[in-house]
Amino acid sequence: MRYNAGSYDIVVIGAGHAGCEAGLAAARMGCKTLVCTLTLDSVAMMPCNPNIGGTAKGHLVREIDALGGEMGVNIDHTFIQSKMLNTSKGPAVHSLRAQADKKKYQERMKKVLETQENLHLRQLEVVSVEVEDGKVKGVLTKNGAFFECKAVIMTSGTYLQSRIIIGDVSYSQGPNGLSNANELSKSLIDLGIDLRRFKTGTPARVNKRSVDFSKMIEQPGDEEIIPFSFISGNIDRDQVSCWLTYTNEETHKVIQENIHRSPMYNGSIKGVGPRYCPSIEDKVMRFQDKDRHQIFIEPEGDDTEEMYVGGMSSSLPEDVQVQMIKTVPGLENAEIMRTAYAIEYDCIDPTQLKASLEFKNIDGFFSAGQINGSSGYEEAGAQGIVAGINAALKVQGKDPMILTRSDGYVGVLIDDLITKGTNEPYRMMTSRAEYRLLLRQDNADFRLTEIGHNVGLVTEERWNKFQERKQNLERELERLKELQITNKTENNEKIVELGSTELKKPIRMYELIKRPELDYFSLACLDPERPDLPKDIGDQINIIARYEGYIQTQLEQVAQFKKFEKKVLPEDLDYNDVNSLRIEAIQKLNKIRPLNIGQASRISGVSPADISVLLIFLEHYRKTGKNTDN
């Protein structure tokens, strides 16, 4: 029986990584927020890999943190190993990765939600989103409770009509043995939302006591622990190791002999899987020139013997999985605790969304996370905080926060999803960001904290710490650019000791730092008046000085990019009325409805010639009295 259960400003459907960030952002911005989850035991659950961050994903976590989100703070409290990846490469691709204690991560995040002012966390299954005259009115639960609200954020993850697949066994269930949501999809279809079917998977977990680590290569954490959050401060903690091993010819033989039993290859799986995280059977069949593949054995927490077998995601039958795992060095006697599985689920076509993550045709209805066709905890959290901020701004009658490709990886992620769409689970990579030297993980706060503060999410504590960090960097850069190092004998002796060449004439310290064999830290011997600053300030100075020319080039590219982004296209424009556009371009433009010329130029099927036509049209449109160039 239906009954009115109360009213909220915002209702969040789902409490995974997107839902947690969305709910916290909305509540912290002063909105009365309800966060619904199928079970309170799955808040911030990690159904797959037990880590946060990694290449490009670490950038997203830093950006979530810079905006005022919780993911970075939460992993800093609960990690069991920390590692900076890609340190042999340039700073644009340096990425922080932390091994999580999965249960502690969940428990702390749940506690944060439970104690957050303005936030009500409840175990409820939402079965429909109710809309009237194109505007959200509320949500209805399976128990008949109707919650009136001004905005809804859908963060339902991989739970919509999800199906677990292990060989020829298939059943209706959510990830990790949890129940799924089978009714919400129909509500979305009734609202005119296009759905598609995606697939992802997870590897087996084995008992630590049954693993022979002597046959594996130890992968310890970094001695210097670098936190994800800009407000965490120094962290000193004992760390655990991960372990590396490899598949071999015997492993591949087991897979090849049983490939006919794989639902990936016999047609049982209809959903599209992630290109950049293929199953082990997919890797073996697609890359037959490779005689081995990496397997990482990762602990799932301090208080469990479960070990994650990274790199062996599979949907092969259980008996084949047992054979396959026992061929891997160190896993000959491994006891499987959880069987690997594939999961199919409903998700939306993200081109139905605006850059604010609000549906174009439903006022007040937002969507974030894997339901939008992305993969990964970090991608979900990044979308979640943007949706939460924009839903709150919507309720408050304010303009949305739109992050562009030059603002951060979050902007790249959202722009890719809403402009190009995706035919497979979308994974963030550094190669997707054109301006990655500007969008480094070390400067996320310089790019985004002011934005987070302006929308009312960044706390005064965080803002004050950011201001101090910003001032320290600016003052030190200014000092170094003015500090002159003379070519006197004493100075030259020290410079030669550092492996560099003597000075022929005086030089500014800032220019001296640019020498590849020198850096800010080693030159302290020539700088007795140097202030005592945190190490991260010195790291920033090294990057800014050494890559100054490249950074300036990218800044010029961004200036050009912004010119097109400022050429706004009319919201109600019917592209059939624009003369000389090709039919394909008209169809794509009418579907995507880009905000501006920049976004239009990134739509697949819209050519440079079409963009020229649009620019001519806009010039005529402007001359008739409607200015679209901000």
UniProtKB/Swiss-Prot annotation:
InterPro entries noted in UniProt: FAD/NAD-bd_sf, GIDA_C_N, MnmG, MnmG-rel, MnmG-rel_CS, MnmG_C, MnmG_C_subdom, MnmG_C_subdom_sf
Positions with a binding annotation for NAD(+): 273-287
Subcellular location: Cytoplasm
Pfam family, one: SAM_GIDA_C
SUPFAM superfamilies in UniProt: FAD/NAD(P)-binding domain (SSF51905)
Cofactors demanded by this protein: FAD
GO molecular function terms listed in the Swiss-Prot or TrEMBL record: flavin adenine dinucleotide binding
PROSITE patterns: GIDA_1, GIDA_2
One GO location term (cellular component): cytosol
Superkingdom, taxonomy of origin: Bacteria
Predominant place of localization: cytoplasm
Biological role stated in the UniProt entry: NAD-binding protein involved in the addition of a carboxymethylaminomethyl (cmnm) group at the wobble position (U34) of certain tRNAs, forming tRNA-cmnm(5)s(2)U34.
Quaternary structure and interacting proteins, as annotated: Homodimer. Heterotetramer of two MnmE and two MnmG subunits.
The protein, known as: tRNA uridine 5-carboxymethylaminomethyl modification enzyme MnmG
